[in-house]
Structures are given as structure tokens and as C-alpha cells.
From Swiss-Prot:
Job description of the protein: One of the early assembly proteins it binds 23S rRNA. One of the proteins that surrounds the polypeptide exit tunnel on the outside of the ribosome. Forms the main docking site for trigger factor binding to the ribosome.
Stretch forming the signal peptide: none
Subunit details: Part of the 50S ribosomal subunit. Contacts protein L29, and trigger factor when it is bound to the ribosome.
Coiled coil: none
Name recorded for this polypeptide: Large ribosomal subunit protein uL23
Gene this protein is translated from: rplW
Membrane spanning stretches: none
Gene3D superfamilies per the UniProt record, alphabetical: 3.30.70.330
InterPro entries: Nucleotide-bd_a/b_plait_sf (IPR012677), Ribosomal_uL23-like (IPR013025), Ribosomal_uL23/eL15/eS24_sf (IPR012678)
Amino acid sequence: MSVIYNKDPRDVIIRPVVSEKSYGLIDEGKYTFQVDPSANKTEIKYAIEHIFGVKVASVNTLNRPGKRKRTRFGWGQRKATKRAVVSLREGSIDIFGGPLS
């Protein structure tokens, strides 16, 4: 059965997550990305495979609620985000690629 994707893969993956925890997961072959909140696991898998040219073993997602922040007009709210932890079958992704300065 063929699946048709309406979203461009580059619209699904927003950016890689840079944190201590995500760096630790890279050694296990797991990469963390911030993704479009409306994207599902199948769309995330398709996007990773087409952007980076690797095979994905599994995708775990988590929704992070926005933090409550104080503004000069009272209390505000940051927007909620969605993250995906992608496990690869083989290969690796050069997320922080480019020449070093």
C-alpha cells in the first residue's frame, strides 16, 4: 500500500535539539529533533529518511507544554513544542556538520 504525504519533509523537522541529554543519546544511535506539533510518527520517519538518507528503526515523541512566563503585562505562556527521539537502524546523522571555524 502506498502512502501519500502532503507535507514537505523540511516542514516536519524544525531543528535538532541541543542539550546534554540529546548529546548522550547520540552515542546510542538516537537523535532528538523538534518537530511540527501536528506531525505524526509516520511523517517524522519519512522526513528523517528522506532528508538524511538513513533508515529509521523507531520514533518516540513527546509533547512539552509551554512554560508560564512573567511579562510586563502579567503572565504569559510560551508555546508548546513537540520533540521526536529517532532511533536509527544503521548509519549516523551529521547534525552539527560544516567546517569548524
